[in-house]
Amino acid sequence: MGDNAEQAVQTDIDIAEILARIPHRYPFLLVDRAEDYNPHQSIVGIKCVTINEPFFQGHFPGNPVMPGVLIIEALAQTGAVLMSKSLEVDTEGKTIFFMSVDNARFRNPVRPGDVIRMEVEVLRARSSIFKFKGVAKVGDKVAAEAEFAAMVVETGPKA
């Protein structure tokens, strides 16, 4: 993740703060906690995968594998936590939207019982738009990787 560990201002981000920073909820919240947060630079998200995940009912019966697109979504949610915290975005009236994904690669399957470590770093940031590179690992094996972009959008107050 780079040599910026000494600049980290917060080691761990718990689920309560994640819920305050991004709008995703069960069954679509795919980040359990985060660590190694470096403002405007990088973050590591953690997802503990269990057999109780709703997608395992159909993907695939008898051979459960986490869908690759959901691994990319988990990377994007981790990036959204980094953006929200770095920009001090108040989630009231604002939403971070996924804009694009490039160079997605799926290397190894993620199965029930795995812990995904999602290493996300900022490649570029301009105003409210961030471009990221993310790598999802289980142990020392890369499960998926991609570059993706997101932006903060004014959505108005909640109804």
Curated annotation (Swiss-Prot):
Catalyses which reaction(s): a (3R)-hydroxyacyl-[ACP] = a (2E)-enoyl-[ACP] + H2O
InterPro entries: FabA_FabZ (IPR013114), FabZ (IPR010084), HotDog_dom_sf (IPR029069)
Presence of the UniProt keyword Flavoprotein in the record: no
Molecular function per GO: (3R)-hydroxyacyl-[acyl-carrier-protein] dehydratase activity
Gene Ontology biological-process entries: fatty acid biosynthetic process; lipid A biosynthetic process
Superkingdom of source: Bacteria
The protein's role, per its UniProt record: Involved in unsaturated fatty acids biosynthesis. Catalyzes the dehydration of short chain beta-hydroxyacyl-ACPs and long chain saturated and unsaturated beta-hydroxyacyl-ACPs.
HAMAP family per record: FabZ
Protein name, entry field: 3-hydroxyacyl-[acyl-carrier-protein] dehydratase FabZ
Organism placement in taxonomy: Bacteria, Pseudomonadati, Pseudomonadota, Alphaproteobacteria, Caulobacterales
Gene name of the record: fabZ
